[in-house]
Swiss-Prot record:
Keywords carried by this UniProt record: Amino-acid biosynthesis, Cytoplasm, Isomerase, Methionine biosynthesis, Nucleus
Annotated positions for site Transition state stabilizer: C170
Entry's EC annotation: 5.3.1.23
GO cellular component: cytoplasm; nucleus
Encoding gene, per UniProt annotation: IDI2
Pfam families: IF-2B
Protein name: Methylthioribose-1-phosphate isomerase
GO BP term, pick one: L-methionine salvage from methylthioadenosine
Active site (record annotation): D250 (proton donor)
Organism of provenance: Hordeum vulgare (Barley)
Catalytic function, reaction form: 5-(methylsulfanyl)-alpha-D-ribose 1-phosphate = 5-(methylsulfanyl)-D-ribulose 1-phosphate
Compartments, as annotated in UniProt: Cytoplasm; Nucleus
Length: 367
């Protein structure tokens, strides 16, 4: 199941899950077998799989594999409790991405409701498995819708039907989702429509998701692309080489403040200064209406080794022993620096005259 292309981060068939080890890309394509939720937790925490949509799907499917042949002895209510506790455990693997916690909450509610009328524990597990599998299928369709909406909107906003060049950050493509991608999905749609001149991607230190993963996807799809250093982005904009920046999101607050890979905030400031449009592309599952603003978003901090050693912490030591390290995985871009938010339901624009996002009304109308 999943996106039917040669490049897939998630390979799933009922009872079996394999994840592409993205730490080894682009030099090796190695898949890791995931047999239960513990394997899923480790794969997410260790960044075998990454990207907000992908980790939510991988988490759900890891538990689906675990319960598929589980000889559970207990009542439906006990089975629902078992699933719920496993989901809570999986959410702890990476706390910033709302997709994971949102999916867990929905699945917990589903099994809890099912337990009220279920005759046995097996039926609880069956309902959970089917719901997890639906997440995988729906994600690809949602991403293609994001790509279509984004490509059409950019062409209208930029007043151009060809020769659009964009800059993206981190990895938001097939490797970060079940297939196609969010921000990279918009780039794919622009390319397939014949209007993309070039995609620029940042290296995205310290884990190098841009140089290792996004560049890999762009080359794989034969999309004209250029890799730049993170520190070259402002110079690129100053030279007039890009008309838009498109990034993904791990969590979007009710006011539009957006948590994304560290360095996104820098790009938004540079874009504002140079008059470059700045877009966020993400599914509505990345929106967290319970948070009034980005100030409430929990920012994950990762191992100092990612900065002290080469290859995002996987290689040799390059920094002086004894130096202290601050290594946040994400930052928050304020809504006032964001031009629009592209979703599978359409594009969220700012309302006049106050120039703010009314995300809650958009979601209610889109239901």
């Amino acid at each position: 199941m999943g996106e039917s292309s040669a490049l897939q981060s998630i390979l799933y068939g009922r009872g079996a899950l394999r994840l592409l080890d993205q730490r080894k890309l682009p030099l090796e394509e190695v898949y890791v077998d995931v047999k239960d939720s513990a394997d899923g937790w480790n794969a997410i925490r260790d960044m075998v799989v990454r990207g907000a949509p992908a980790i939510a799907i991988a988490a759900a499917l890891s538990l689906a594999v675990e319960v598929n042949d589980h000889n559970f002895i207990g009542t439906p209510a006990e089975a629902a409790s078992f699933v719920s506790k496993k989901l809570e455990y999986l959410v702890s693997s990476r706390p910033t991405a709302v997709n994971l916690s949102d999916a867990a909450t929905k699945l917990q509610n589903l099994v809890s409701t099912t337990a009220e009328t279920a005759k046995d524990a097996k039926s609880i597990f069956q309902v959970f498995i089917e719901a997890a599998e639906t997440m995988l299928v729906d994600d690809v369709a949602d991403n293609k819708a994001i790509g279509l909406h984004g490509a059409e909107f950019l062409q209208r906003q930029l007043g151009s039907s060809k020769n659009i060049s964009v800059l993206t950050h981190c990895n938001t493509g097939s490797l970060a989702t079940a297939g196609y991608g969010t921000a990279l999905g918009v780039i794919r749609a622009l390319h397939s429509g014949g209007v993309l001149e070039k995609a620029f991607c940042t290296e995205t230190r310290p884990f190098n998701q841009g140089s290792r993963l996004t560049a890999f996807e762009l080359v794989h799809d034969k999309i004209p692309a250029t890799l730049i250093a993170d520190s070259a982005a402002a110079a690129l904009m100053n030279n007039g080489q890009v008309q838009a920046v498109i990034v993904g999101a791990d969590r979007i607050a009710a006011n539009g403040d957006t948590a994304n890979k560290i360095g996104t905030y820098n790009l938004s400031i540079a874009a504002k200064h140079h008059g470059v449009q700045f877009y966020v592309a993400a599914p509505v599952t990345s929106i967290d209406l319970s948070l009034p603003s980005g100030k409430q978003i929990v920012i994950e901090e990762r191992s100092p080794k990612e900065l002290l050693n080469s290859e995002g912490g996987l290689g040799k030591q390059v920094a002086a022993s004894g130096i202290s390290v601050w290594n946040p995985a994400f930052d928050v871009t304020p809504a006032d620096l964001i031009t629009a938010i592209i979703t599978e339901k359409g594009v969220i624009t700012k309302s006049d005259p106050d120039g703010t996002f009314d995300i809650k009304s958009f979601i209610e109308c889109a239901k």
